[in-house]
């Protein structure tokens, strides 16, 4: 078996697509159904392609039943390797994975295999279940099929608890090796008198496969469409159908009110959530044509491929192309979605469908596909809580990849710049921290990793406050949708989220890891560089940026004070700290961090100064007290410290710049509370690392000197 070719997509579009570009979620879901039709070789109901994983590697168990006598005669089942020539005879019709029996008499097990016990109980049980479905049994009634008697006979054979069914179970266990687990298909072959069939032109007994019997085709179609008009309808006559303009087709047709919706955004199951909704009249609220309802159902597996579940929410990123839908676009879209089944080098979680589809098309060898990805690729993104309650948290109907690309580029520039370069006053890169491990030597690799982080939730989650899995309305996902749509974020909101996360990380009394603050600075700087930050009078990013990490120091690394001073000057060299109040808040944080490190590391003080000065609880008055104490201790500790300067002051570079910045105490600084707190924690994170990083750079200089020393010349001849 091979995948669909471009002719399959052309035929599917001609048969089932309305002709205009996708303009709604329902359009996109119907489009995925059309792609699935092409996958099935043009079949709206049959799905031969789903048997591809079973061909050659799987087995076909056939149950022969002779219905030419007075009572059914069931032979022992036979087993053989499933071959490609068998597939068309089985008339398999797929129902989305994990949703019970499939639509056809032919049933399948797991692609990973079933043992003998599993085949006898689970797969054979699905055959039995199929014969009991009301929609299947309806072919035996007044509005049934002339050959409905065949289904009646099958129901009798597979009746639960019957001797025949139990005998079949035992026969299958005896037939199959008990320790062998293989992908398995079960079907039923019937021996019938052809003359009894309503549409038969033959006579006499012969064997019929499922694909040869019209009644099984009709039963399969009724099963597939059974719930489209009556699912959970408890009012009126229990059916919701009528005539109206179809939501997708834009033409007057028979519409149904309870179609299977792959995402579940419309349901009559919870009428309280939709005041005024009459279940039997839901077709007026959500008029979906009968064929469109089947397209929704058929495309379910493709839709499900495009979801990222994390925490208590699920985010669908459904790719499509703007403009006229051509066979080439349909084929390319199908191929990109299928690529989501493969492992990714950039996303361990297997998520981020938006990123993976984008790069599948961008990195295609076909220049036409590259151009399509650049100009016409769109995503319908929608985030909902996981569970029955399908209130939409955030939605973006036509998200381009432009702003994600801009953000990814800005993120790569940020991590390759001073912010993550200790020699230039920044923090160090760290493994296993989403925004601190991107500084690879290859800029393009960093950008690609960044793209995955942004659409995979890590960009926002690394900086924002925690939300529990039980929180349905996750504001972080709202923010993700805004960024994808290119909507700038307000700085005051960001500062509040950053400080709430800081608080989350400090529960238990411990200081948050400095990496938290470093990620928040990377986050803020990236937004600023991408033009997605509002509410500040200056940009965040440092004024001079390169895409290459500086590898050689251009300052004196033989002196610890010189290293500290250079790093402090570089840290402050950003527009954010041009405003005196912000600069002073950051410098106050630096000094408190430096003094606290000294207390903890050099004097074994059990409760250093910053343990009493929580950044997220900081007020101007409490900062004034902490700063006064830090200045006093910097003088006192200098009296007996081996790191004192010739001015009898610890960390004079910080004190000097603070006094140069302002002569006022914090209570007089013109700065908002959250802005004050964030600038302080930035400075504090730098100050806490001031001496450790200086030691590292100083030791690195010593090692470099040793490496460059030339060995003495040998005096031996």
From Swiss-Prot:
GO cellular component: cytoplasm
Pfam family, one: Cas_TM1802
Stretches for region Disordered: 263-283, 698-717
Location (main, coarse): cytoplasm
InterPro entries: CRISPR-assoc_prot_Cas8b (IPR013389), CRISPR-assoc_prot_Cas8b/Csh1_C (IPR013420)
Alphabetical keyword list: Antiviral defense, Cytoplasm, Plasmid
Function: CRISPR (clustered regularly interspaced short palindromic repeat) is an adaptive immune system that provides protection against mobile genetic elements (viruses, transposable elements and conjugative plasmids). CRISPR clusters contain sequences complementary to antecedent mobile elements and target invading nucleic acids. CRISPR clusters are transcribed and processed into CRISPR RNA (crRNA). Plasmid targeted by CRISPR locus P1 transform wild-type cells very poorly. This subunit might be involved in stabilizing crRNA.
Name of protein: CRISPR-associated protein Cas8b
């Amino acid at each position: 078996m091979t995948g669909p070719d471009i002719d399959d997509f052309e035929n599917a579009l001609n048969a089932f697509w309305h002709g205009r570009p996708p303009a709604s979620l329902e359009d996109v879901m119907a489009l995925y159904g059309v792609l699935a039709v092409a996958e099935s070789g043009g079949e709206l109901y049959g799905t031969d392609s789903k048997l591809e994983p079973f061909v050659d590697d799987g087995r076909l168990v056939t149950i022969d039943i002779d219905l030419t006598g007075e009572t059914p005669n069931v032979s022992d089942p036979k087993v053989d390797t499933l071959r490609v020539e068998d597939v068309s005879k089985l008339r398999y019709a797929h129902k989305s994975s994990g949703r019970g029996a499939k639509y056809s008499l032919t049933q399948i097990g797991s692609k990973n295999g079933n043992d003998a016990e599993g085949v006898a109980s689970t797969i054979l049980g699905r055959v039995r279940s199929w014969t009991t479905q009301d929609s299947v049994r309806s072919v035996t009634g007044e509005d049934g099929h002339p050959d409905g008697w065949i289904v009646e006979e099958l129901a009798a054979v597979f009746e639960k608890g019957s001797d025949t069914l139990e005998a079949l179970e035992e026969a299958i266990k005896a037939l199959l090796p008990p320790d062998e687990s293989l992908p398995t298909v079960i079907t039923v072959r019937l021996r019938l008198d052809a003359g009894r069939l309503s549409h038969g032109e033959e006579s006499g007994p012969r064997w019929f496969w499922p694909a040869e019997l019209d009644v099984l085709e009709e039963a399969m179609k009724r099963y597939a469409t059974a719930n489209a008009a009556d699912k959970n309808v408890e009012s009126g006559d229990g059916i919701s159908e009528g005539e109206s303009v179809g939501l997708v087709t834009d033409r007057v047709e028979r519409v149904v009110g309870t179609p299977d919706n792959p995402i579940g955004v419309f349901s009559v199951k919870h009428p309280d959530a939709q005041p005024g909704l009459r279940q039997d009249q839901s077709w007026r609220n959500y008029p979906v044509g009968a064929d469109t309802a089947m397209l929704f159902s058929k495309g379910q597996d493709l839709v499900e491929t495009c979801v990222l579940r994390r925490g208590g929410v699920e985010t669908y990123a459904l790719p499509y192309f703007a403009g006229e839908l051509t066979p080439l676009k349909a084929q390319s879209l199908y191929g990109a979605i299928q690529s989501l089944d493969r492992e990714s080098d950039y996303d361990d979680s297997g998520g981020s469908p938006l990123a993976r589809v984008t790069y599948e098309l961008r990195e295609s060898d076909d220049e036409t596909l590259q151009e399509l990805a650049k100009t016409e690729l769109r995503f319908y993104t929608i985030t909902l809580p996981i569970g029955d309650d399908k209130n939409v948290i955030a939605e973006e109907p036509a998200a381009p990849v432009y702003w994600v690309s801009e953000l990814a580029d800005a993120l790569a520039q940020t991590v390759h710049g001073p912010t993550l370069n200790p020699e230039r006053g920044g923090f160090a890169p760290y493994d296993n921290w989403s925004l601190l491990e991107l500084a690879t030597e290859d800029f393009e690799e960093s950008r690609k990793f960044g793209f995955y982080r942004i659409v995979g939730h890590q960009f926002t989650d690394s900086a924002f406050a925690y939300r529990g899995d039980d929180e349905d309305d996750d504001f972080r996902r709202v923010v993700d949708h805004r960024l994808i749509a290119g909507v700038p974020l307000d700085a005051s909101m960001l500062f509040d989220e950053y400080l709430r996360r800081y608080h989350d990380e400090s529960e238990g009394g411990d200081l948050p890891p400095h990496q938290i603050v470093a990620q928040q600075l990377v986050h803020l700087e990236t937004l600023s560089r991408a033009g997605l930050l509002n509410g500040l009078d200056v940009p965040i990013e440092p004024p001079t940026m390169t895409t290459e990490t500086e590898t050689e120091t251009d300052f004196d690394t033989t002196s610890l004070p010189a290293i500290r001073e250079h790093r402090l000057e570089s840290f402050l060299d950003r527009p954010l700290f041009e405003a005196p109040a912000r600069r002073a808040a950051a410098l106050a944080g630096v000094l408190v961090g430096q003094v606290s490190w000294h207390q903890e590391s050099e004097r074994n003080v059990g409760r250093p100064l910053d343990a009493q000065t929580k950044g997220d609880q900081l007020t101007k008055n409490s900062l004034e007290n902490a700063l006064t104490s830090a200045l006093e201790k910097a003088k006192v500790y200098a009296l007996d410290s081996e790191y004192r300067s010739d001015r009898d002051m610890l960390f004079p570079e910080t004190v000097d710049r603070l006094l140069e910045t302002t002569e006022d105490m914090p209570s007089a600084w013109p700065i908002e509370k959250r802005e004050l707190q964030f600038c302080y924690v930035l400075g504090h994170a730098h100050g806490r690392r001031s001496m450790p990083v200086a030691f590292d750079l100083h030791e690195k200089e010593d090692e470099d000197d040793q490496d460059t020393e030339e060995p003495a010349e040998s005096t031996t001849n």
